[in-house]
């Protein structure tokens, strides 16, 4: 009799990784040359990053690449929650790192549990997302209904994420990461007035990290954009992690469904067009006063109502509408929406 595994790896992590392949991400094994030969101080996949850099900047030399790469490593050590690197990938350095205008010219990869290590301290995100070899996002998953010390898995992960942001040993990894997502593959439940379960995303921050839900308003449209999950891809991943026996288990097949809470969330946030929108227009650095009254740089991510409002305004403008009214509820982020609108629509 085959023993069934019921843990976050089999119930959420593997199904999530396989779902990302539906969205067009290529899977990298931990034993692949790209992962083994990465820059361990930043987790940049050197072979992919170099190839893409020299393709986008075909006038650049090998020496130019080496110089720019060293500049990135130095920038990621700065105490600026990644602001310098953020400006760099938005072409402020004079070089192109991401082709923002033609998404398919970029490469998209995922890998499981790539270690982020500095000295004796380390953490391993469940899934790391690489664009052109740059680890710009990661995803942490929790087992559904896992309660420890009176806390749900989501609440524990939120606290763990905040502690990582405060750890100077992890500065390079924090600064290069643009978006973090967490999920326990459960539907949202706000009945107790707090977000104890579900799927959330955030950007890195010094303090007061804000975790945002994503409640899809275009379900049919985004689901129709998914490609099929092939048996060959399932076999490849399960064999790679030595879990091929899962393939015949009914629960695993259920967790692979594209409409599961975690997978639906990943579609909403990691569909390539959506992710590029968030990375290009949905992140902002602002100076705020901390609890001591000191000015502190913070980073915020666009919330889902602001995203859908921005896209609705765009559709209205395309239809020739010149004026109108945007209705807001209290605390819905009117000022931030105005900023994001101007950045995107100008």
List each model region and its residues:
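ATP-dependent helicase/translocase motor core
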Residues: 2-346
